[in-house]
Amino acid sequence: ARPMLTAALYIPRILQYTGCKRREEVVAMSDKKIIIDVVVDVQKDFITGALANEQAQANVAHLAKVAKAHAEAGHWMFFTRDTHEDNYLDTREGRHLPVEHCIEGTDGWNFAPELEDAMDDTEPEVSHIVCKKTFGAYMLPSDILDELMAHNKAVDDIEKIIVYGYCTDICVISNAMVLRAAFPEVEIEIRSDCCAGVTPQSHQTALDALRACQFTIV
C-alpha cells in the first residue's frame, strides 16, 4: 500500500535532490501551499450532446472563466474525462443508463469548446487529464500523489481542493467522495455555481449530501 505522503516522509528525498543541508531549508522551500482544481467531465455530451443539460449550457462559460482564472493564479488543474467504449450498453452502467455517451474518439467525448479555449490561453504549472470509465476516477488520488512527488511536495502542502463540473448528483459527488476518502484532512470545496445536476432538484440534493459529509459548499 502507498504510504501517506507527509512532509516528514519527503524531507530525506528533498535533501538528496536539492542539495539543501538543513531541515529548516526544506521547510522554507515547501511553505507555499497548493490549491488543486478538479474539473469534472466538462464534455460536450453532458452539455449539448447525448445527455444535454440546460443548466450546464447556462453556466459552462462561467465555469471556463473560473478554471482559467484559477489556472492563471497557479492552481494545479486536474480534468476528469468520462471515457467509454463501443460496448458501453453491455456494461453495468449502460444497462442502468442506456444512452451511449462519451465514447472515446467521438465528438461528444471532447471537452467543451469554452473550456478548451480558456485553457489554451493558460499554462498551468500542472495540467493533468484523468480518463475514467465510471462515475468516480479511482486513480485521481494516485495522480495527485504522483504530481506531489514530482514537485517535492506532500499532502500537507495542499491548502484545499476545489471540485466543480457535471453532473453534480453523479460524477461530481462521486469524485468528491473519492477525494475525501483519500485525503481525509484536506479541505475540499464544491463550487456550486460551476456545477449542474441532471435536474435542479437533484443538483440541490447532491449539494445537501455533500454538505452533510463536511464538504464546503460555495
Predicted regions and their residues:
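Generic short N-terminal amphipathic or hydrophobic helices
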Residues: 10-13, 157, 187
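Active-site acidic carboxylates
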Residues: 23-129, 155, 185-189, 198-212, ...
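Histidine-anchored nucleotide/phosphate-binding helix
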Residues: 66-67, 173-181
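Conserved N-terminal glycine/acidic-rich loop preference
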Residues: 132-174, 196-218
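Short, Lys/Arg-enriched N-terminal segments with co-localized hydrophobic residues
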Residues: 1-3, 8-28
